[in-house]
Amino acid sequence: MRLGHRLGFLSVAAVLPLSAAAQPTPKAALLALSKQDHTLSIIDPASLRVVARIPVGDDPHEVIASADGRTAYVSNYGFGAFHTLAVIDLVAQKQLPFIDLGALRGPHGLAFVDGKVWFTAEAAKAIGSYNPATGKIDWIMGTGQNRTHMIYVFPGAQRILTTNVNSGTVTILDHTKGPAGAPAAPPPGRAPLPGPPGGDWNETVIPVGHGSEGFDVSPDGKEAWVANAGDGTISVIDLASKSVVATIDADVPGANRLKFTPDGRRVLVTAGTLVVLDAATRTVVKRLADVRGTGGILMQPDGARAYVACSPVGYVAVIDLKTLAMAGHVDVAGPDGLAWAVRP
């Protein structure tokens, strides 16, 4: 489905009661969290209208959708105090029971890869995965880093990257293959239990800059770019050598999110305003002063638009990626996390 039709400047208030489900969820939907109202807005990207708002619990920060586009998962962060993921049925437009993460407190960054929900747990200095098919957390790995905040999981889940804000580092976890362990001895009269999975995880911790938070992996999988909020710089990591190969003095103090465009040509950074860089030359090409108080960034899959959460001014800005100009906005109170939900 192509969503990148030309649009004029459009502002949509779309004030709906939480109980209203006046319109069905579109097959391709934009999801936007409101940290102020503690809700998830389901937005039709064709009309930029909010079709539903659904409660998601306290302090929602990040959102991700399942591969089939039917379910959304939201991290209830609480700066380390909370330990739940909210679950939303996007078709029925209703909240489902929370996922209790137990001691894995401070969930924040999310990814949905290989049928599982991957999450960071800041207060536990760990990451984990939740399997919706079994309803269980099936994997946990400590990082040993302070404020493990955002996560990127490669297809196949054999490589995982995280940013660790207070440590000023990036963690790369690589899975090495090996034979499975021997089965455990079964109780009398029962079948043998499966042995532990083979292989191991190797961790590489890469120092970057102060306040490393927002990051993204280039579409070709060769580089990771990291926004360092404390330094106002961007670190470029070569993922083959696992080393920093460039530090860009982009003048982006407070930068908290960074995303590549789908074609890999540009990089968008939120740092009070929206900053656009050329990925090849690693230079700033534009600063959009009218996109204010910026937070989460989401790319439209066809590369026509970007969506930027502007929390202090209460809307999600729509950016035309051809003109690099703001083309409209959708009113969402205190927006932050953004995601796509696409049903076949």
What do the predicted segments below correspond to?
Residues 1-9:
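Bacterial N-terminal signal peptides that target proteins for export
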Residues 13, 18-344:
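Predominantly soluble domains enriched in secretory-pathway, periplasmic, or organellar proteins
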